[in-house]
Regions:
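Glycine-rich active-site loop/strand segments that organize a redox cofactor
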Residues: 1-3
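Rossmann-like dinucleotide-binding cores of NAD(P)H-dependent redox enzymes
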Residues: 6-12, 16, 89-90, 95-99, ...
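FAD-binding core/adjacent interface of flavoenzyme oxidoreductases
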Residues: 9-101, 158
């Protein structure tokens, strides 16, 4: 576990060095693409310290979104068998089965990973397709591949509650 954190920190430092070396300006904040602009790529960035908002234009723009788990209103904060992505990366022990809520890129990556380790995986998605931010044909190919591997996919499924199993 500590080794994986050390490697991640080393890679992160290396990327920062390469960006600086190649004179890439990095803005730490919250950004979104301006949908009104079609010819020029424009991004609006609110800096992390909330001091100001910038409008940036560039030929090439990279938005590194990062990842953060979302609190779900129907999940008890004292639930002991509910993991966020950090726990899923370094589980206390390998479960025999796992339900993954959400089929975005991170959820599907965990589904594949745990399936490869022999865990029975079910993915639950509220929308009608997995990987809802991707092209439909990509979603269909991934769904077909995952089903062949034994991953259960439940789309159009809304969770109402999650409880601890004792």
């Amino acid at each position: 576990t500590q080794r994986s954190r050390d490697v991640a920190n080393q890679l992160s430092s290396g990327i920062k060095h390469l960006l600086k070396k190649n004179k890439v300006t990095v803005f730490d904040g919250f950004g979104y693409l301006d949908k009104k602009t079609t010819e020029v790529k424009k991004v609006i960035v609110r800096l992390k310290n909330n001091t100001k908002t910038l409008e940036l234009t560039a030929k090439n723009i990279i938005i590194a979104t990062g990842a953060r788990s979302r609190n779900l209103p129907f999940v008890s904060s004292d639930a002991i068998n509910i993991w966020d992505y950090k726990t899923a990366m370094t589980p206390p022990k390998l479960p025999s089965s796992l339900v993954i809520i959400g089929s975005g890129a991170i959820g599907m990556e965990f589904a594949s990973f745990y399936n490869d380790l022999g865990v029975n995986v079910t993915v639950v998605e509220a929308l009608n397709t997995i990987l809802p931010n991707e092209d439909e044909d990509i979603s269909q190919v991934v769904a077909s591949n995952f089903k062949k591997r034994g991953i259960i996919i439940k789309t159009n499924t809304l969770l109402k509650s999650v409880t601890n199993k004792t």
